[in-house]
Regions:
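The serine-hydrolase catalytic nucleophile loop
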Residues: 55-66
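Conserved alpha/beta-hydrolase "acid-adjacent" motif
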Residues: 260-265
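Conserved acidic catalytic loop of the alpha/beta-hydrolase fold
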Residues: 98-115
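Flexible "cap/lid" loop of the alpha/beta hydrolase fold
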Residues: 141-179
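Conserved hydrolase catalytic core segment
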Residues: 113-157
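Conserved alpha/beta-hydrolase
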Residues: 69-87
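Catalytic histidine-centered segment of alpha/beta-hydrolase-like enzymes
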Residues: 283-295
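Short beta-strand/loop motif that positions the catalytic acidic residue
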Residues: 247, 253-255
Length: 307
């Protein structure tokens, strides 16, 4: 395992050294006066990375191997409002409509007529809403281990977590009790697995990967305000999969065969008219633990639509 992690680090450092030659960072102020951190890496056709969480930041993808794609396209990283290195909203506005409006204001400020999207995890919900509201701005999209239905994802994590807990009778009694709110049981499952030191199994193949990710996400300059606020907006817990049938841009869906955080069959809920699906061996962090395989699966798609 240690050897595999060292190989991942070595490959990521090589890509980082390449990308540093073509990197610029800036802050873009939205129409409601929120300063968003934006970073461009590489050259070529612009590709917006929409991070997950909910309410995480783009730092994990960049530092855990995602920057490999900057060899072929220009990755546009940004931290969503109230996330990472971006400011919080003074108006306390974290509504879905406002968040996706941020995406398009970034596009306009950077001067792109169109761009592609790579969305990860919870970013799938945001990407779907963005494509639904601003269809003319998107050339193509990559959905990387994305959810379009948070309740479905919560249920998937609970069921797999019970397997990891050996289907203990008392655990099943609590976690399958529908009188307890689903989101509470979801959070409690993560807490229970964390106490047992096996929470990594929902997201990663290796415990070392989770430890490294935790070390990045706990850096003091990263904020998590959006992660706290979005739970007050019921709209985020809708089922977004019906909207996929109305989104006509080319879509590549990547799903990890061991992505128990999202659900290994979640991709079957997606019905984009122009969709290609690729299943890759691995968990939720394919960009980190299976970087080479992910790069080889996604890059031909990016190149195809980069004209």
């Amino acid at each position: 395992m240690c050897k595999n992690i060292l190989l991942i680090f070595s490959f990521a450092l090589t890509i980082s050294a390449f990308a540093q030659e073509n990197v610029d960072s800036l802050y873009i102020t939205t129409s409601d006066s929120v300063k968003l951190f934006v970073k461009r890496s590489g050259t070529g056709y612009p590709v917006l990375f929409i991070h997950g969480g909910p309410g995480s930041n783009s730092y994990y993808f960049e530092k855990e191997g995602g920057d490999v794609f900057s060899k072929d396209v220009q990755l546009v990283y940004f931290d969503q409002r109230g996330c990472g290195r971006s400011d919080s909203s003074s108006l306390n506005d974290y509504s879905l409509t406002r968040v996706v409006k941020d995406f398009d204001e970034i596009r306009q400020k950077l001067g792109y007529k169109q761009w592609m999207i790579i969305a990860h995890s919870f970013g799938g919900i945001l990407a779907t809403q963005y494509a639904y509201e601003y269809p003319a701005t998107i050339k193509a999209m990559v959905y990387l281990n994305c959810t379009l239905n948070l309740p479905y994802t919560a249920q998937s994590a609970i069921m797999k977590g019970l397997e990891f807990l050996s289907n203990n009778k008392e655990d099943r009694k609590y976690f399958l009790n529908d009188s307890i709110p689903l989101l509470k049981r979801w959070g409690d499952m993560f807490d229970t697995l964390r106490k047992e030191r096996i929470v990594y199994k929902l997201m990663f193949d290796q415990a070392q990967s989770k430890a490294y990710d935790d070390s990045l996400m706990s850096l003091p300059f990263l904020k998590y305000v959006y992660a706290q606020k979005l739970w007050n907006y019921s709209e985020y817990f809708d089922d977004f999969s019906p909207k996929t049938s109305q989104i006509n841009v080319p879509v590549l869906v990547i799903s990890g065969t061991r992505d128990y955080t999202i659900g290994v069959d979640h991709y079957k809920l997606m019905h984009f008219p122009n969709m290609e699906v690729k299943l890759l061996e691995g968990a939720h962090a394919l960009y980190f633990e299976h970087n080479k395989e992910l790069y080889e699966a996604v890059t031909p798609f990016l190149r195809k639509y980069s004209d």
